[in-house]
Amino acid sequence: MLEVVTVRIPRRFGFHPIRDIQVLTPMNRGGLGAHALNEDLRGRLNAAAEPRLTRFGSTFAPGDKVIQMVNNYDREVFNGDIGFVREIDLEEGRMNMDFDGRCVTCEFGELDEVSLAYAVSIHKSQGSEYPVVVIPLVMQHYTLLERNLLYTAITRGKKLVVIVGQPRALALAVRNRRASRRITGLAQRLRTFKAGSEENH
């Protein structure tokens, strides 16, 4: 999965691994949860950045991709906004971030409002769109594998969507209509996509 995000998609399609590619995962915890994937992806994409700052269980460095976790009307950044760490000022106790070309400054004591965003939960991605979405699906996530969650993840991608994982987990997600019956045609679209991709290989 890490190689798909950091090497294969950028090399084959020309997308930037940090700016363009968003990993969306069903869970926050576990080996393929957002927390572990954020550390793994940062290790591949931004390992050498300094200085590093750890607050509220998260470590930040210049160049890191971050997500705003709550609405902050004073700073005009809102839940789900994606930005990038510009600078960490250890003397002043502030971290400067770039949200859509706008500099937003956060005091170290307020960094519980921000989290790493190389990978985010599918739930957290609702309402957002990204050029490329990569979705890890494994049976470890079985309690959350539902058709509406898969639909949400797939529809976040504007140009390319890549599902990485176990076919059994994908089949379970497509079959499982526990939460909603309003989504139609997803199973057929995935079968058509799979048939088309097999013909191209």
Give residue ranges: language-model regions.
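Conserved helicase motor core of P-loop NTPases
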Residues: 1-75, 86, 95
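C-terminal accessory regions
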Residues: 79-201
